[in-house]
UniProtKB/Swiss-Prot annotation:
Role of this protein: Catalyzes the reversible interconversion of serine and glycine with tetrahydrofolate (THF) serving as the one-carbon carrier. This reaction serves as the major source of one-carbon groups required for the biosynthesis of purines, thymidylate, methionine, and other important biomolecules. Also exhibits THF-independent aldolase activity toward beta-hydroxyamino acids, producing glycine and aldehydes, via a retro-aldol mechanism.
One Pfam family cited in the UniProt record for this chain: SHMT
Cysteine pairings via disulfide bonds: none
Site (Plays an important role in substrate specificity): 231
Molecular function as annotated in GO: glycine hydroxymethyltransferase activity; pyridoxal phosphate binding
Compartments where located: Cytoplasm
Protein name, per record: Serine hydroxymethyltransferase
N6-(pyridoxal phosphate)lysine, modified sites: 232
Subunit: Homodimer.
Lineage: Bacteria, Bacillati, Actinomycetota, Actinomycetes, Micrococcales
Record's keyword annotation contains Cytoplasm: yes
Keyword field: Amino-acid biosynthesis, Cytoplasm, One-carbon metabolism, Pyridoxal phosphate, Transferase
Organism from which the protein derives: Kocuria rhizophila (strain ATCC 9341 / DSM 348 / NBRC 103217 / DC2201)
Amino acid sequence: MTESVTNQPLSDVDPDVAQAIQDELGRQRSTLEMIASENFAPRAVLEAQGSVLTNKYAEGYPGRRYYGGCEYVDVVENLARDRACELFGADHANVQPHSGAQANTAVMAALMQPGDTLMGLSLAHGGHLTHGMKINVSGKLYNIAAYEVEPETYRIDMDRVREQALEARPNVIVAGWSAYSRQLDFEAFRSIADEVGAKLWVDMAHFAGLVAAGLHPNPVPHAHVTTSTVHKTLAGPRSGVILCEADLKKKIDSAVFPGQQGGPLMHAIAGKAVAFKIAASEGFAERQRRTIEGAQILAERLTAPDLAEHGVSVLTGGTDVHLVLVDLRDSELDGKQAEDLLHRAGITVNRNAVPWDPRPPMVTSGLRIGTPALATRGFGAEQFTEVADVIAQALMPGADVDALRSRVDALTEQFPLYPGLEEW
């Protein structure tokens, strides 16, 4: 790399990548993002991630690095750790995991030996692949005892979880999900873990932003270890964080570095520090209130009689969180068809398996629809009511996709994304 290239903008050095980024910005601006695991990072977070911290190697932890010149990245990492602890009331935070999956894998390595038993929610019933999926490292290294939702309610029955834990005697119980629309009983999970001599690990990747806003029970006081991503409801960089009790600090830190990772991504850690600061603000809490309100408006519309007539329903009958799980098993549409139809209308969602789904994973019989990105964009009850009706109309036979797209266009124009940003 020459000095001249070092100082040239992306559009000059690589116009192909620059154009793809610009096109993606256009896509995000012109559509309604309703994938439950996605959000719009504040510009301050994007700037932190695009900073010169990208250049710095910093193996180790603040005050104990294996490279020189780390005095300023130490400041950044300490800010991120302290803010995470304060935000969630944790004894210790490790902000180095590159992703939520890395955080989860590190926790398992810290708390278990290969062959130990992990008990988590089945992937087919809303769990995450790192909670014991057979082809994931969690399913390869550990013995898995998966619990499921109840067939009548699609909810987790804690009495059943206790019965299974008493039989399986797991070393670790993980409470968390990727597709579940109700709050978990963390106190009950801890009681069960204590009864069977297990550690309780909570994966709050999806609902951490709701916890930070005080709108969802905080798992940290109940869990031995808590993990999260930072980019979902927290709207930070794509990355992970681990929170733990003080006596597990050394085990957790060692499992992350040198156990699984080398140099931390200091630009991402800077983005985490910024995101945690924003998450402590009243503006953030207000956004989370609109996030939940929007999901509940959506759930109410999708349980209306006109949709029920066409075989569309909502798992658990509603939601306590930021997402709605749509059941299409009795509909003319499968999950992929519904996802594609909504895409044509300008709404991005993801097809999702429902419990006991008869269709293959690439097709599915459901949709997972989330509201965080639209709340970040500024949507309130009025706009969520309109979006909910657009989705409802799209899922009924004979939908006029062009007319629905016009309604979506009106919303995106009313709430511009990253205004003033002409070129990225």
